Amino acid sequence: MKAILLLAIFSVLTVAICGVSQNYGNVRYNYTELPNGEYCYIPRRRCVTTEQCCKPYDTVNNFAACGMAWPEDKKRKVNKCYICDNELTLCTR
């Protein structure tokens, strides 16, 4: 019983000291219709140009891009939509 109590106290102290990490991958984006009648491509979807990708709501701190990435089959690189943070240089994948 004493070991369980010590483990619980240690866990609480660890969380209090280290904190909970933020998930920067969840940037909200504006799902809108494009001029050609299609809807914009969500992050991680294949794209040809950046104009096809959904733009973030916060355009001051974030931007959308179409960049190269390895697909799941890892045969060749493909273009995928990303939303990136200007300051942290983190992109959703």
Curated annotation (Swiss-Prot):
GO terms for cellular component: extracellular region. It comes from the Eukaryota. It is found in: Secreted. It holds the Pfam family Cys_Knot_tox. This is U8-theraphotoxin-Hs1b. Keywords: Disulfide bond, Ion channel impairing toxin, Knottin, Neurotoxin, Secreted, Signal, Toxin. Residues 1-18 form the signal peptide. Disulfide bonds join C40-C54, C40-C81, C53-C66, C84-C91.
